[in-house]
Amino acid sequence: MAFYAYAAKAVEVAVNVDTGEVQVLRCYGATDLGKAINPKICEQQSEGGMAMGIGSALYEETVIVNGLILNPSFTDYRVPLAAQMPANECMQSIFVESAPHKDGPFGAKGFAEGVVTGMEPAIANAVYNAVGARIKELPVTPEKILQALRGGS
């Protein structure tokens, strides 16, 4: 049995062209749920997933050199701080309750993965739309943005 749920993301960013820093100002996540059993929990799951996607897009990277992980702990592994997240009122979850899924509990579909995926390309494309820097490798770092703005690859 498969639960095919669809999702889409949109983000608004501000990019500092002097430093390459990106701030996600607003983000929207639309998800097909089938039937939302508990809409508040669905909203919290969606916003948590968008936050995870922001971390994946802008900060998180496992650095490996000669087979050795150079950032094996949260001391060295970058994750976003609360101050680097959009304000709660700037994260919006949009739920599409399609026909109840015949095999899902009470007609619901699984949607946990869909709330994370899509943030990375949405952020990379928002950076491109804002300043013309096309970043093709995650994370989208200030260094990569500045290099792209200077004409590097």
Specify the residue positions occupied by each region the protein language model found.
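C-terminal catalytic domains of large/alpha subunits in multi-subunit enzymes
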Residues: 1-153
